[in-house]
């Protein structure tokens, strides 16, 4: 992470750049040209300018002020990382937090500016020179990079800014000029995902996508999101930390499929595979020319996952059809091979987790207390021993005591603490196996607990079980079920601000849509074959955190005269710590569910454990 001094210098240099471009503010989102949650280092401009390294957030710099918006998962971490920098934390989602446009407007007190260059584009020098050192009454300008902002985001931001008398200007990425030693775009080799794990040929997937395009009246589409490209073509990569994807675009029409990526990434084996499947390849930068020359009458773009510049490159004769991603709902429903892969991956992951928990128990018993980083390294090492392990699926969250209240905490040498034989350890982790992706959270009692720790742990467990036990009509959306995870804690006046669950990719991104469990409305229906996490939590700043998470598979429950009903089947196989539970708070059916779950965990994992590990696991049920 950058030193605070470096952040201050970068903001100073950016302000000089802004004055040269005639800008009064500049906005840095978290995304890249592929509009994903996780991005290669090359496009981590928000982190570069602010020092905040969370996966979600927006940094805004004006000529005199700076602020960063992020959600509740990162409130505590962001406050710490922004301390000593020009950036003020804006807690997104809270009633008192202003919108970005409101805040910018409040920071710009009048519209009289000395223009040194009223153009964002470096080649418009004539207009800039004519305005040099001249004073005008103008509309204050807010700059963004059109390559890293979605179509929907640009429109919404433009409307919001205009309402408060500000003008949105799309132009260059200032980091191109200011970021010293900026990492390049990754050129790691692409790999083929075998059919035994993919479960469907890329030819079949392409045919399904073409059929969906025809139904929407579109002749073609640009696929931007990296996990969608990887899924569609049955390819994987290592360009994004913890996510097996590669930097590319796909332009698909009814007659052709073209993959735009760095030629260095294409091995001999992959080149033969692409040729066999009639997939053309062009350099990554070739998409610009291809869109400018696009001859189709219509092109479908997803406004929430396509960057603004894609549509602006198209000829005026091309009609853009806007529609939510056609691939996301296809990818979300796992086929038989993918489900089999998930089940097998969860067994291996469960074995690694049990071995880790046994190790932790012995370490605490011996007095050789590990640190949070030790916990991370040990668990990763045990996972790496498992067949088909490729990587972790996200940076491990090992938060002891107060660190457990930092929802997306990551231990560093500066923050690392040694565990003690008391309190709670919140451990959220996962792995990328070639046949499946895992995501699991366990909160572990290391010794005596306070009544608050026990009660919070029990409320979280009750919420997890209530949602996990749900039976619901096919087509129900996650918003309608989210309350089940929160109901028990709401009775105590407790809540958490993050979502309750997200989809999980098949050896792809650990966060996947379009379905979720969350309070705000998400229209995507829950359907058989979808994977989704259930992860309620309680976080007390400066004290402790508790979260319990399993990855679930949505399966058919029963058909009646009232319709089809679905249920959630746990895929994750790992014991849930029972020592913190206040049993008087648990209902009989909740206890029965927990007992049945632990019985299944033992039956499925014990064949792969040694006698000592079996004995310990047997005590957990």
Description of each model-found segment:
Residues 1-621:
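Active-site neighborhoods and metal-handling regions in enzymes and metal-associated proteins
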């Amino acid at each position: 992470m950058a030193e605070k001094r470096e952040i201050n210098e970068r903001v100073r240099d950016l302000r000089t750049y802004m004055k040269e471009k005639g800008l009064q503010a500049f906005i840095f989102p978290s995304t890249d040209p592929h509009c994903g949650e996780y991005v290669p280092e090359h496009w981590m401009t928000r982190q570069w300018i602010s020092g905040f390294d969370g996966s979600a957030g927006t940094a805004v710099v004006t000529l005199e002020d700076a602020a960063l918006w992020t959600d509740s998962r990162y409130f505590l971490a962001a406050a710490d990382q922004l301390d000593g920098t020009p950036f003020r934390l804006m807690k997104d989602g809270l009633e008192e937090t202003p919108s970005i446009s409101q805040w910018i407007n409040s920071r710009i007190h009048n519209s009289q500016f000395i223009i040194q260059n009223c153009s964002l584009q470096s080649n418009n020098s004539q207009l800039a020179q004519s305005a040099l050192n001249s004073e005008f009454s103008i509309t204050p300008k807010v700059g963004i990079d059109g390559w890293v902002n979605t179509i929907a985001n640009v429109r919404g931001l433009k409307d919001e800014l205009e309402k408060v008398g500000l003008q949105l200007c799309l132009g260059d990425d200032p980091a191109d000029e200011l970021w010293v030693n900026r990492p390049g775009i990754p050129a790691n080799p692409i790999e083929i995902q075998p059919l035994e794990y993919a479960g469907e040929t890329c030819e079949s997937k392409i045919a399904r996508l073409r059929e969906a395009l025809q139904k929407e009246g579109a002749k073609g589409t640009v696929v931007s999101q990296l996990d969608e490209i990887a899924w569609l073509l049955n390819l994987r990569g290592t360009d994004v930390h913890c996510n097996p994807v590669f930097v590319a675009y796909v332009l698909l029409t009814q007659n052709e499929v073209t993959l735009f990526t760095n030629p260095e990434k294409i091995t001999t084996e992959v080149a033969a595979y692409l040729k066999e499947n009639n997939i053309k390849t062009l350099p990554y930068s070739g998409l610009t020319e291809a869109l400018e020359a696009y001859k189709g009458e219509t092109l479908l773009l997803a406004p929430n996952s396509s960057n603004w510049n894609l549509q602006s490159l198209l000829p005026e004769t091309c009609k853009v059809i806007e529609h939510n991603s056609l691939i996301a709902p296809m990818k979300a429903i796992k086929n038989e091979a993918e489900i089999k892969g998930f089940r097998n991956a969860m067994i291996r992951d469960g074995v690694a987790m049990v071995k880790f928990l046994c190790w932790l128990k012995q370490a605490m018993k011996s007095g050789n207390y590990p640190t949070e980083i030790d916990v991370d390294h040990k668990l990763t090492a045990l996972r790496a021993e498992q067949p088909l392990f490729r990587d972790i699926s996200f940076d491990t969250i090992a938060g002891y005591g107060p660190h457990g209240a930092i929802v997306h905490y990551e231990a560093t040498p500066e923050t690392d603490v040694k565990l003690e034989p008391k309190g709670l350890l919140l451990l959220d982790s996962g792995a990328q196996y070639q046949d499946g992706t895992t995501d699991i959270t366990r909160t572990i009692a290391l010794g005596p607990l306070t009544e608050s720790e026990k009660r919070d742990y029990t409320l979280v467990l009750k919420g997890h079980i209530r949602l996990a036990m749900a039976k619901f009509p096919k087509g129900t959306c996650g918003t309608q079920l989210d309350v089940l995870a929160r109901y028990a804690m709401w009775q105590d006046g407790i809540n958490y601000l993050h979502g309750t669950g997200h989809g999980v990719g098949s050896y792809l991104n650990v966060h996947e849509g379009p379905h979720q469990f969350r309070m705000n409305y998400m229209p995507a229906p829950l359907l058989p074959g979808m994977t989704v996490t259930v992860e309620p939590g309680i976080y007390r700043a400066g004290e402790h955190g508790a979260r319990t998470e399993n990855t679930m598979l949505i399966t058919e429950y029963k058909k009646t005269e009232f319709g089809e009903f679905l249920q959630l089947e746990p895929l994750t196989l790992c014991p849930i710590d029972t020592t913190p539970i206040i049993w008087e708070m648990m209902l009989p059916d909740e206890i029965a569910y927990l007992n049945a779950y632990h019985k299944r965990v033992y039956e499925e994992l014990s064949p792969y454990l040694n006698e000592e590990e079996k004995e310990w696991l047997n005590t957990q049920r």
